């Protein structure tokens, strides 16, 4: 049994140059854990609260208050306590905060400590994090990556409405081969855009952000890049979208500014269905606004038996909200973001609940990331079938892919890449 000896919080910078919380935890057996918390650009209104200082410092985005909470209230409560029971520790943190959305201490403060304790406890047991978090008796599995190679919406300063255009290299036997495929397509897309005289600057998540006339133009460019790289769109490489519809939703309608069009929920479901019919799209995230549950029902009835429909802003990694969606037959997949809910235990609970309901889980980064690679371990530990962690450039994104390569090597012959099984059986 290892007890918590010391907890320290600090303010560090994320990949967008904004402050975030990092925590260090030492146990009395000498084990050490460190974790840094990411931050989103398009956020769900029901996410756990990320505590920011306001004022002029760092344009109001400082996290000194959250760090102070780590170094006082949280440290005093945890010091001397056991690190062996993650669920009990996280419950203590939740109770210590006492609010329904962690707005007293800050989800960024709570999560940094929750993750750092998990890291320290893993080292205390002599295990990598994915083994420490893994359910007893379950086999490790490498997830299929959703690679965001073209950005629009809130993740880029361009005219494309859909926030993320992703490739999923599913037709491969090993994660390392899937990663190579993604990297080659990324470089092919850069050439395609350069030849058209378009920008090859990248957005927050490392994807290109060209000024294209429509969402279909973005899809066509990606299809061309897949073919130029020598791969088959659909068979080897599928497409996925993050529509981030909450950013498009105003006055009860969905607005595509780049195309000068707007739709009601049924019309927008039709628009997305047309894209699915025309392109090898196997997954759509946030296809409707987070508050438009009737629209989600329409979309699920229209496309839920055909493709994966992922709830991000809809579910915000919250088991209670997910249960409502399951009960109402809305979506068939959940995006998993640690900082949306604020503790390791609640995140694991959301994945377990999704799995029991037949929903897939997609473990995800945020647009404001750090060098922390814990989500790679989380995806492997929970057998989440997919991971979404950006493009094939920017160290904050590539760090997660590199961690998955290390895990694959460590697992050796036991390293199973999920490939086409990433999607529900009825989707192939």
UniProtKB/Swiss-Prot annotation:
Mg(2+) binds at residues 242, 285, 312. It catalyses: (2R)-2-phosphoglycerate = phosphoenolpyruvate + H2O. The keyword Nucleotide-binding does not apply. InterPro entries: Enolase, Enolase-like_C_sf, Enolase-like_N, Enolase_C, Enolase_CS, Enolase_N. SMART domains: Enolase_C (SM01192), Enolase_N (SM01193). Its cofactor is Mg(2+). The keyword Cytoplasm applies. Its main location: cytoplasm. It comes from the Bacteria. GO terms for molecular function: magnesium ion binding; phosphopyruvate hydratase activity. GO terms for biological process: glycolytic process. (2R)-2-phosphoglycerate binds at residues 163, 337, 366-367, 388. Pathway: Carbohydrate degradation; glycolysis; pyruvate from D-glyceraldehyde 3-phosphate: step 4/5. Catalyzes the reversible conversion of 2-phosphoglycerate (2-PG) into phosphoenolpyruvate (PEP). It is essential for the degradation of carbohydrates via glycolysis. Belongs to the enolase family. This is Enolase.
């Amino acid at each position: 049994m290892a007890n918590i000896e010391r907890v320290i919080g600090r303010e560090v910078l994320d990949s967008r140059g904004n402050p975030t919380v990092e925590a260090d935890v030492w146990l009395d057996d000498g084990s050490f854990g460190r974790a840094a918390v990411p931050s989103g650009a398009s956020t769900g209104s029901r996410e756990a609260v990320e505590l920011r200082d306001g004022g002029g410092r760092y344009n109001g985005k400082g996290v000194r208050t959250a760090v102070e909470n780590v170094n006082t209230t949280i440290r005093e409560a945890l010091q001397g306590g056991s690190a062996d029971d993650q669920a009990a520790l996280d419950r203590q943190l939740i109770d210590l905060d006492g609010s329904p959305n962690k707005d007293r201490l800050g989800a960024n403060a709570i999560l940094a400590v929750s993750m750092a304790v998990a890291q320290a406890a893993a080292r205390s047991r002599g295990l990598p994090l994915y083994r420490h978090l893994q359910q007893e008796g379950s086999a490790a599995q490498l997830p299929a990556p959703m690679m965001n190679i073209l950005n629009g919406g809130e993740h880029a300063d361009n005219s494309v409405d859909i926030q993320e255009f992703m490739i999923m290299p599913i037709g491969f036997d090993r994660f390392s081969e899937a990663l190579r495929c993604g990297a080659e397509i990324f470089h092919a897309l850069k050439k395609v855009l350069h030849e058209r005289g378009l920008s090859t600057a990248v957005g927050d998540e490392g994807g290109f952000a060209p000024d294209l006339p429509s969402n279909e133009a973005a899809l066509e460019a990606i299809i061309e890049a897949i073919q130029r790289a020598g791969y088959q769109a659909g068979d080897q490489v599928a497409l996925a979208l993050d529509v981030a519809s909450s950013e498009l939703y105003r006055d009860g309608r969905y607005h595509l500014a780049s195309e000068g069009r707007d739709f009601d929920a049924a019309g927008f479901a039709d628009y997305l269905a047309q894209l699915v019919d025309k392109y090898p799209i196997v997954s759509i995230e946030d296809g409707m606004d987070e508050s438009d549950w009737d629209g989600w029902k329409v979309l699920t009835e229209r496309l839920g038996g055909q493709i994966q429909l992922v709830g991000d802003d809809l579910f915000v990694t919250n088991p209670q909200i997910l249960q409502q969606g399951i009960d109402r037959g809305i979506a068939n997949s959940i995006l998993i973001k640690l900082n949306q809910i604020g503790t390791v235990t609640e995140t694991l609970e959301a994945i377990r609940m999704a799995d029991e309901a037949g929903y897939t889980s997609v473990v995800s980064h945020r647009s404001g990331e750090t060098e922390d690679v814990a989500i790679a371990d989380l995806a492997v530990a929970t057998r989440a079938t997919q991971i979404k962690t950006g493009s094939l450039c920017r160290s904050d994104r590539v760090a997660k892919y590199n961690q998955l390569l290390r895990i694959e090597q460590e697992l050796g012959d036991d390293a199973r890449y999920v490939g086409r099984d990433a999607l529900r059986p009825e989707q192939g």
